[in-house]
Amino acid sequence: MASYFDEHDCEPLNPEREARNNMLLELARRVRGAWSWAPGSRSLFNRMDFEDLGLVDWEHHLPPPAAKAVVESLPRTVIRSSKAELKCPVCLLEFEEEETVIEMPCHHLFHSNCILPWLSKTNSCPLCRHELPTDDDSYEEHKKDKARRQQQQHRLENLHGAMYT
């Protein structure tokens, strides 16, 4: 049996290509609007913010650091005898009884001097990659867009599946 797209001689939506096309159109609009021959005008590229244009490809860059307020608010947990045999996944040293450690939202435990340098570089748990919020607005917007695209793709797959059941 032919697929819906074969029957109607059309291509499925490609959110990445659509986003890239929209980004290029926006770049062209900004280039046209930013170009100025007025005396004292600055360089075209000094006037444009490539992050605002969405030209930072977060899929191929490391995520930004975790938000400072979020890191400071992570719960500190005191190790009790029942958890004393656990080890810090970064330094592999066993936690000592009555030692204070940092607990991530994913419930992984770390020594503060092991996890804090990590979170100053990236926003995720080193074990499971659970992401913490960042102070980078463009990255947060990228995460929301990615979730919307995944939801749209899921709805499209459900719709397509419902047509043939």
Curated annotation (Swiss-Prot):
UniProt EC number: 2.3.2.27
Catalytic EC class: transferase
Pathway info: Protein modification; protein ubiquitination
Segments crossing the lipid bilayer: none
A biological process term (GO) from this entry: protein autoubiquitination
Pfam families to which the protein is assigned, alphabetical: zf-RING_2 (PF13639)
Region (Disordered): 136-165
Any GO MF annotation of the entry: ubiquitin-protein transferase activity
Coiled coil start-end: none
Entry's Gene Ontology cellular component terms: cytoplasm
InterPro entries: Znf_RING, Znf_RING/FYVE/PHD
Segments forming RING-type zinc fingers: 88-129
Function: E3 ubiquitin-protein ligase which accepts ubiquitin from an E2 ubiquitin-conjugating enzyme in the form of a thioester and then directly transfers the ubiquitin to targeted substrates. Catalyzes monoubiquitination of 26S proteasome subunit PSMC2/RPT1.
Family affiliation: Belongs to the RNF181 family.
PANTHER family: E3 UBIQUITIN-PROTEIN LIGASE PRAJA (PTHR15710), E3 UBIQUITIN-PROTEIN LIGASE RNF181 (PTHR15710:SF160)
Protein name as it appears in the record: E3 ubiquitin-protein ligase RNF181
